[in-house]
Every structure is written in structure tokens, then in C-alpha cells.
């Protein structure tokens, strides 16, 4: 049984996560399909990603220094007021690019402290022997909400028209909803999540010492830990690549691929997001029972290689069915990799430095996504069906990261348990 405090936090996370997921689908589609300015979104995404570098470094030290409950209260309170303001502005003046960009960027900044705090809290309130089970449940609940948000997003941004697959399922016509209404829904769920977090009471499994020193000094402690533990460093960076590419694919490449290469509507885009979550959910349920039978590093390497070939398939194929198949399979590989990766790091990184170590890895994530985001925002990739070349590049990068894991396998396996 999961700790009651963690169950309540997961419920709060699920409430706000549904509308966040809807919005993270709606905003990229707004730029690609409604404004026909996918390159604008590419630049916004790259710029926002770079800006989160400094925030994520600071966020990691906050996670290690302050009560994780207080952090979640702050996240949800600020989300309610900020997104509520944007929704109000949209209802008065109509949907505007700056409003869409602000909502998306704010959510990106929120994610950079929300998910590290969630994993740190889970580690803090869980016994060591329960790490794998807890991580599986984190993945299951997160992806369950992604399934729900993807399905709702398909209806909200694409509507339901006569003759469509969704019309056959639901039997009603629904017009697409304006973006400011989606943002308003997001604001309200932040408020509900804040109310749930208020009820959380917990006793940590591990005692944390009060942290001292500046943000830079505490960040250096995370760097120092990785320098002293080369196996953790190499594994953490190389295994992160699959998540970096997934974020780029979901937020920047997929809407352009569906709109320009497949020439399909918003339903296909949103359903791709939903079916990805179905695959991730299946992986979470499957690995919860079978995790002990897997060798973490070798399994991650195999899944990364498999995902590389899936990306290459997007370069070759021009099929709505393939992009749906691609989405469900990368859902499996991404979620499976995340469960194995987080569990491995829980076992090798002490809780007192987990936030700072994750901040260092996140800095690598952010710089990589900024570079790739700028490259893929070039006019070439956003013209006609050229976005498929971006998928080919992603496949090559994944293969290179897999080779890094293979070459350093002995060093990673020799890592002594620190936690």
C-alpha cells in the first residue's frame, strides 16, 4: 500500500495534470494549425527551454532545502492566479499569440519544479524496498491522466464533426473550444489541487538536514557528487536522451508532422498524444509486476535502440496509422525507461542531494532541447513534409546515446550503492 500522503499528492497531481496535458496539446496546435506559424512556436519553445535552465538549477536547491508540501502549495497557488489572469484576458480580448505563449511557457516552468519535487517527495516518504513499486505507481497515475487529457484535447481542439470517427463513438457534434477556455479549466484545477495538498500530513522515512550555502554552492555539490561517481554521471546523461527527444517530438515536431506531412486534422494529433499515454500506462502496469526481472541499464539500452528505429520509420512512412503505432510504442519505451532510470537513481543517489543531482541532469536536458529546438525551427524543417528529416536526426542521436551506454557498461555496473 502506498503512503497516504503520497496517495493524496497523486490525486492532486492527477487533477491539475489533466488540464495541463490538454493545454500542452492545444497551444502547439494553435500555432501550427490556426496561425500557420510553427516556426514561431519553435523559437518560443527553444527560448523558453533555455530560460528554464536557470530556474531549474535554482529549483533543485529549493527542493532539497524546503518542505516539498510547501513547494506544491506554492506551485498550485501561483498556477491558479497566473492562468486565471490569462483566461480572463482571453475572454475579454480573444485568443492572442502572446496569451498562448505565456500559458505554455508558464507550464514549462512549473514542470521544472513539479516533477522533481514529486519524485523527491516519493523517495522521502517511501521505504527503500518500495522504490520500484512507488515509481511504477507514479508512472501509472501520470499516464492515466495523460490518456484522459489526450482524449479530451482531441474533442476540445478538433471538435466532433459528422462523419468523423469521434462522431461515430459519441454521436454528437461539438465545435472546437477557444484556447482561453482551456486555460480557464487549467486555472480551476490548480485551485482544486491546492485544496487537496493542504490536507497532506506525513513523516519522512529519511531525515533531511537543513541545507546551508548559496544556490551556486549547493548546485556545485550536485556537480561534485557526479564527478565523484562517474557511473551515475554517464548513466544519467545517456539515459536522459530518450526523454529529451520525446519532449521535442511531442511539443514541436508532432503538430507539424501531422499538419504538414500527413495533412491531417487536430483529432489525429490529440489522439496520438492519447495513445502515447496508453502505451506508457501499459508499460507502468507491466513493469510494476516484472521490474525485478530486468537489468536496468541493458534494458534501457535496448529500448533506446528500438525507439531509434521507430523514429526512422516516421522518416520513411506517410501514414496516420503509423504515427499512432509510433506513439503507442514510444509510450512503452519512454515510460519503461523512466521507471528503470528513476529507480536506479533512487538506489544510487542519496535523498539529501537528489534535487541538486537532478538539476545538473536537467541542465543537460534543457541545453540539448534548446539547441535541437532552434535547429528544428529552421524554415527547412517547417516546409512541406521536411519535418520527417527531424525524426531521422532524432533516431541517429538515440543510436549514439545507446553506444555511449554500451561502451561504459562496466563503469556503470561498477557503481557502488550510495543511498
Predicted features along the sequence, with ranges:
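Intracellular juxtamembrane helix-capping segments at the cytosolic ends
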Residues: 27, 113-126, 336-349
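Transmembrane alpha-helix termini and helix-breaking/packing motifs in multi-pass membrane transporters
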Residues: 29-33, 87-92, 148-183, 260-261, ...
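C-terminal transmembrane bundle of multi-pass solute transporters/carriers
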Residues: 42-48, 53-65, 69-81, 85, ...
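Cytoplasmic helix-loop-helix junction between adjacent transmembrane helices
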Residues: 103-144
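Helix-loop junctions on the cytosolic side of multi-pass membrane transporters
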Residues: 120, 124, 175-179, 183-213, ...
Amino acid at each position: 500500500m502506498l503512503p497516504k500522503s503520497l496517495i493524496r499528492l497523486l490525486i492532486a497531481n492527477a487533477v491539475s495534470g489533466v488540464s495541463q496535458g490538454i493545454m500542452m496539446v492545444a497551444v502547439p496546435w494553435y500555432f501550427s494549425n490556426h496561425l500557420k506559424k510553427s516556426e514561431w512556436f519553435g523559437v518560443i519553445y527553444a527560448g523558453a527551454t533555455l530560460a528554464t535552465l536557470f530556474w531549474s538549477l535554482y529549483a533543485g536547491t529549493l527542493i532539497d532545502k524546503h518542505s516539498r508540501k510547501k513547494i506544491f502549495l506554492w506551485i498550485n497557488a501561483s498556477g491558479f492566479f497566473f492562468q486565471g489572469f490569462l483566461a480572463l484576458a482571453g475572454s475579454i480580448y480573444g485568443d492572442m499569440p502572446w496569451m498562448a505563449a505565456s500559458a505554455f511557457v508558464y507550464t514549462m516552468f512549473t514542470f521544472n519544479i513539479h516533477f522533481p519535487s514529486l519524485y523527491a517527495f516519493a523517495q522521502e516518504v517511501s521505504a527503500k524496498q518500495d522504490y520500484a513499486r512507488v515509481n511504477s505507481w507514479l508512472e501509472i497515475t501520470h499516464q492515466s491522466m495523460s490518456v484522459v487529457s489526450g482524449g479530451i484535447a482531441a474533442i476540445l481542439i478538433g471538435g466532433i464533426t459528422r462523419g468523423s470517427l469521434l462522431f461515430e463513438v459519441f454521436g454528437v457534434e461539438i465545435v472546437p473550444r477557444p484556447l482561453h477556455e482551456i486555460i480557464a479549466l487549467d486555472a480551476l484545477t490548480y485551485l482544486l489541487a491546492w485544496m487537496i495538498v493542504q490536507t497532506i500530513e506525513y513523516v519522512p522515512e529519511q531525515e533531511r538536514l537543513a541545507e546551508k550555502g548559496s544556490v551556486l554552492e549547493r548546485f556545485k555539490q550536485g556537480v561534485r557528487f557526479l564527478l565523484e561517481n562517474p557511473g551515475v554521471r554517464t548513466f544519467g546523461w545517456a539515459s536522459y536522451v530518450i526523454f529529451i527527444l520525446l519532449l521535442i517530438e511531442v511539443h514541436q515536431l508532432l503538430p507539424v508532422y501531422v499538419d504538414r506531412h500527413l495533412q491531417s486534422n487536430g483529432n489525429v494529433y490529440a489522439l496520438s498524444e492519447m495513445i502515447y499515454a496508453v502505451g506508457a500506462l501499459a508499460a507502468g502496469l507491466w513493469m510494476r509486476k516484472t521490474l525485478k526481472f530486468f537489468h536496468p541499464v541493458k534494458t534501457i539500452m535496448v529500448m533506446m535502440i528500438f525507439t531509434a528505429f521507430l523514429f526512422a520509420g516516421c522518416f520513411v512512412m506517410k501514414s496516420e496509422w503509423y504515427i499512432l503505432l509510433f506513439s503507442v510504442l514510444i509510450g512503452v519505451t519512454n515510460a519503461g525507461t523512466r521507471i528503470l532510470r528513476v529507480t536506479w537513481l533512487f538506489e544510487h543517489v542519496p535523498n539529501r542531494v537528489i534535487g541538486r543531482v537532478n538539476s545538473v541532469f536537467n541542465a543537460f536536458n534543457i541545453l540539448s532541447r534548446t539547441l535541437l529546438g532552434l535547429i528544428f525551427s529552421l524554415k527547412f524543417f517547417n516546409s512541406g513534409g521536411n519535418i520527417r528529416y527531424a525524426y531521422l536526426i532524432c533516431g541517429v542521436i538515440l543510436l549514439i546515446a545507446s553506444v555511449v551506454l554500451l561502451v561504459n557498461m562496466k563503469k556503470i555496473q561498477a557503481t557502488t550503492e550510495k543511498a
